[in-house]
């Protein structure tokens, strides 16, 4: 692997310009001091509303003290370019950014304050970030460049399947491959039975599941394919097709595993459906998790201008991702706060659901106002810290 120098490597994280959380901590006496976890996410970031400079940055949320900190800039990204449709997974204390598509932000001529995205390329690039040494390195590239694909870790190997190889056009692929982190090598896997993109990958029952997505198989009832899943048996080296595993013809937003259960909270059109759902593999159905009903992740006291005036008008959500840690589900939300052209900021809010509790499962931590506007580029990943 080739080492890289992050654009921020010469600057201490404590002095870098980045969305910085307010000095608010939340005592959590029920938490054990060890093990410690960090929830990492990649954002597009700009400091001012009319800012022409947009960066791709990675932040870390510490669930013990309810605080965001700047980790680093993502290397290899030009100014005003953002990365989307990539996978972000962890193996040990390393984070891998796999594939994705690069877009360039450009101002619209008719309205200089508004930006549009222009597709640049689909990447095969794989980056590795060590959370201990804070160093980036490049790994062996994907065999097939892809974005909007399924990805998950099983037995310390990274599995990817499906996705798209072009930025324009709704054309998916059915190829799959696996990365050995020790050998720094990608190996092709058998093709799935149908093409899929915007599908979700998750490891469940020691098998790599590729769930939902937009599909094509020539089926006269295409929604049947979009409701299905492909399951790769690592030991047998073959795919199985599971009908009706997702139930919707709209792709899922995110699926995680907690206490050996599959968990979902929304789809790509409605990322928060108002409740958490869990999968019953015996019935092949999704059911609401008891006590998880929560109509809105934004408290009613928050208004569109960031003040507490009792208005129910919601802020514009630009971030929502879910992470599982032990028996907890964390929902990390971010909302754009309107301001003048000289500044902008984001309100960060974290909710936690305790799957082991029988009542009062929800807890909402103190909101944080962070400098600049940061919009989520991909789902988060969890790292157990040494």
Locate each region found by the language model.
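Kelch-like beta-propeller repeat domains
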Residues: 1-386
């Amino acid at each position: 692997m080739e080492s890289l120098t992050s654009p921020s490597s010469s600057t201490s994280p404590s002095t870098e310009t980045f969305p910085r959380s307010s000095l608010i901590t939340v005592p959590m006496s029920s938490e054990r001091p060890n093990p410690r976890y960090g929830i990492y996410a990649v954002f597009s970031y700009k400091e001012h509303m009319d800012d022409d400079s947009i960066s791709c940055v990675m932040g870390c949320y510490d669930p013990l003290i309810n605080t965001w900190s700047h980790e680093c800039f993502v290397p290899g990204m030009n100014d005003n370019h953002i990365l989307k449709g990539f996978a972000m997974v962890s193996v040990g204390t390393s984070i891998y950014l796999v594939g994705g598509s690069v877009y360039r932000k450009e101002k619209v001529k008719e309205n200089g304050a508004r930006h549009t995205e222009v597709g640049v390329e689909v990447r095969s690039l794989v980056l590795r970030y060590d959370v201990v040494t804070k160093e980036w390195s490049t790994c062996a590239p994907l065999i097939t460049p892809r974005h909007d694909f399924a990805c998950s870790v099983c037995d310390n190997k990274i599995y990817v399947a499906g996705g798209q190889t072009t930025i324009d056009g709704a054309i998916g692929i059915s190829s799959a491959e696996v990365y050995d982190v020790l050998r720094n090598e990608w190996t092709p896997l058998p093709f799935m039975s149908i093409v899929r993109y915007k599908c979700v990958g998750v490891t469940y029952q020691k098998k790599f599941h590729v769930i939902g997505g937009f599909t094509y198989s020539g089926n006269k009832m295409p929604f049947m394919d979009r409701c299905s899943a492909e399951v790769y048996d690592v030991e047998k080296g073959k795919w199985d097709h599971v009908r009706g595993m997702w139930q919707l013809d709209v792709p899922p937003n995110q699926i995680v595993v907690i206490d050996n259960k599959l968990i979902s909270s929304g789809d790509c059109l409605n990322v928060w459906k108002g409740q958490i759902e869990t999968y019953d593999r015996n019935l092949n159905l999704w059911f609401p998790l008891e006590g998880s009903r929560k109509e809105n992740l934004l408290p009613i006291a928050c208004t569109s201008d960031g003040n507490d005036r009792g208005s129910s008008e919601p802020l514009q959500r630009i971030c929502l991702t879910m992470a599982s840690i032990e028996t907890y589900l964390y929902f990390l939300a971010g909302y754009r706060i309107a301001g003048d052209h000289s500044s902008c900021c984001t309100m960060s809010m974290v909710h936690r659901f305790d799957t082991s509790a029988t009542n009062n499962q929800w807890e909402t931590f103190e909101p944080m106002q962070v400098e600049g506007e940061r919009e989520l580029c991909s789902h988060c990943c969890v790292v157990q810290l040494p």
